[in-house]
C-alpha cells in the first residue's frame, strides 16, 4: 500500500500484473490509487518507470529538482526509475482523487520505497 499522511491512507488496488517475457527480470503492474480529501504521500521512489493517468479530482505531483505540477482528470505524469517523488497529494480537502499507475519494474521489487530527505 502507498503510504500517506497519518489518518489519511491512500487506498491502492492492484488491477493487473504480468511477467514480461521479452524482459525476464521485469514485470508490469497496474494499480489504482484513491486519495481521500487532503491525503498526501510520504517522500518515496518507485525504482520503476511509472506512467500516471488521472481519473478523478486533482492531484499535485513533484519530483526532486523539478517544479510541482497540478493534474486533473484526463492528464498524465511520468516518473523514471531514479526519480524521487517529493510531493504527491490530493489538491482538494473536500473531494477524493483517483488515478491509475502503470509500473514497469524489477520482478518482485516493491511498488514504493520510502526515502528519507
Where are these regions (language model features)?
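Histidine-centered metal-chelating micro-motifs
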Residues: 40-42, 60, 77-90
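Glycine- and acidic-residue-biased ligand/ion/polar-headgroup-sensing regions
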Residues: 46-65, 73-75
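Short, low-complexity, Pro/Ser/Thr/Gly-rich segments in the mature regions of secreted, periplasmic
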Residues: 108-117
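Short acidic-glycine-tyrosine-enriched beta hairpin
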Residues: 13, 17-25, 35-36, 65-82
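Ligand-binding loop in jelly-roll beta-barrel domains
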Residues: 68, 83-109
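Extracytoplasmic
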Residues: 25-30, 49, 66, 82, ...
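Sec/Tat signal peptide C-region and signal peptidase I cleavage site
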Residues: 5-9
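Extracellular/periplasmic catalytic domains that process cell-envelope and extracellular macromolecules
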Residues: 24-25, 45, 53, 70, ...
